[in-house]
Amino acid sequence: MEFESVIGLEVHAELLTNTKIYCGCTTEFGGKPNTHVCPVCLGLPGSLPQLNKRVLELGIKAGLALNCKITKVGRMDRKNYFYPDCPKNYQITQDELPICRDGYIDIELESGEVKRIGIERIHIEEDAGKLLHTKRGTLVDFNRAGVPLIEVVSKPDIRTPEEATLYLTKLRSILSSAQISDCKMEEGSLRCDGNISIRERGTEPFGIRSEIKNMNSFKALEKALNYEFDRQVEAVTNGEALSVETRRWDETNNKTIVMRSKEQANDYRYFPEGDLVTLNVSDEWIEEIRKTIPELPYQKADRFVKEYGLPKYDAHVLTLTDAMADYFDECAKLSGDPKAASNWIMGDISRLMKEESTWVEDLKFSPKELAELIEVIKDGTISSAIGKKVLEDMFAEGKSPKTIIDEKGLKQNNDEDAIRQLVNKVLDENPQVIEQYKSGRTRILGFAVGQVMKETKGQANPGIVNKLVTEEVEKR
């Protein structure tokens, strides 16, 4: 029997607001424990929430960016549960009337096929506090309590861990590019839970699902889903009964561990939040918000393919971050050579950034100066080999290409008479070049070219050197 996985993701993203969802406390990351708090986010008696309009705006913006229908009349609800990091013993969230429904994200599979992953709903809610487990006991920090979130719930359309990674990668790029969330997984501003079950391939009914928590990176997401698929297949194959449960990914031991049996919706006793008014969203406001959505990464990638003729892979890599996409876009326009701009950014510049653990935002030279480097190589001022050395100096010092070329005397030698003299010198010192060439081993010319380039410290024009080496060998 062959099994397939059925996967749905629940993604929490902290919203880019200055203050919390129901009070005026800062949402700034960090700070001393329990200093970004007030009676409202601590749930003290007599305190009343007031919804931050910016939270609703960003929730609608997320829905529009993810092709959702926007709920015109909605409400907030109480989700009741008892846990130390939940100061009110309930969370103000949305149950029956989420702000957005029925969206989708298209992902491109390795085969080139485009697959649509449905989005069931997006709702706004408040974050909980944070528990810190120490040898002396468990401490609670309420700085995060009340920080606004959206939860993006996908439909169970994902079939492999690889598809899950593609979906989450694209979701993160959209939310980040649209300035909805900074999506920093390392700071907890993007968190992902996965629901996975198995079924016989080709059948419709869903199996018994497990919810997986603590998947704090893309690598952890794939490893956890792969492990859980194998665990469930092994259990079913051995005749064991699966149960609905919540499990967590143990990064140290590379396995999922049972936390508790999975709660059902009625366990939370949802009911409308009486301290907040009904949410009314007008068509005019929706259109105002729509106008604030910038060109999204996948739209940029499509434009780079159509406008610049880039391969899909290059366009995808260049749009992984807004900063890289914008840097390339400007350089491509200024240089008039998008492919060269793409090659430099994806090649040597990416290598240098990786070696120094820096980002495009940290580059000391502008797109205009990279375009200048492309131009001086194209017009023969320097060779491509020298261009790589110039780029390294630009990366380290932030000087313009022309300044570096002038200071170091790197201009390419295009003097045919001078180069011809060097060619003859190399051929005189290496008579085997002539012998081997005349016996049919034409590759030996590459050796002669290399020797001439060595004599000129790479500054001779390679095209001229190649031409003159061939001419002089033919004469002898």
Curated annotation (Swiss-Prot):
This is Aspartyl/glutamyl-tRNA(Asn/Gln) amidotransferase subunit B. The keyword Protein biosynthesis applies. Pfam families: GatB_N (PF02934), GatB_Yqey (PF02637). Allows the formation of correctly charged Asn-tRNA(Asn) or Gln-tRNA(Gln) through the transamidation of misacylated Asp-tRNA(Asn) or Glu-tRNA(Gln) in organisms which lack either or both of asparaginyl-tRNA or glutaminyl-tRNA synthetases. The reaction takes place in the presence of glutamine and ATP through an activated phospho-Asp-tRNA(Asn) or phospho-Glu-tRNA(Gln). InterPro entries: Asn/Gln-tRNA_amidoTrfase_suB/E, Asn/Gln-tRNA_Trfase_suB/E_cat, Asn/Gln_amidotransferase, Asn/Gln_tRNA_amidoTrase-B-like, GatB, GatB_C_1, GatB_Yqey_C_2, Gln-tRNA_amidoTrfase_suB_CS. The gene is gatB. Heterotrimer of A, B and C subunits. Keywords: ATP-binding, Ligase, Nucleotide-binding, Protein biosynthesis. GO terms for molecular function: asparaginyl-tRNA synthase (glutamine-hydrolyzing) activity; ATP binding; glutaminyl-tRNA synthase (glutamine-hydrolyzing) activity. SUPFAM superfamilies: GatB/YqeY motif (SSF89095), Glutamine synthetase/guanido kinase (SSF55931). It catalyses: L-glutamyl-tRNA(Gln) + L-glutamine + ATP + H2O = L-glutaminyl-tRNA(Gln) + L-glutamate + ADP + phosphate + H(+); L-aspartyl-tRNA(Asn) + L-glutamine + ATP + H2O = L-asparaginyl-tRNA(Asn) + L-glutamate + ADP + phosphate + 2 H(+). Belongs to the GatB/GatE family. GatB subfamily. One of its GO terms (biological process) is glutaminyl-tRNAGln biosynthesis via transamidation. Its EC number is 6.3.5.-.
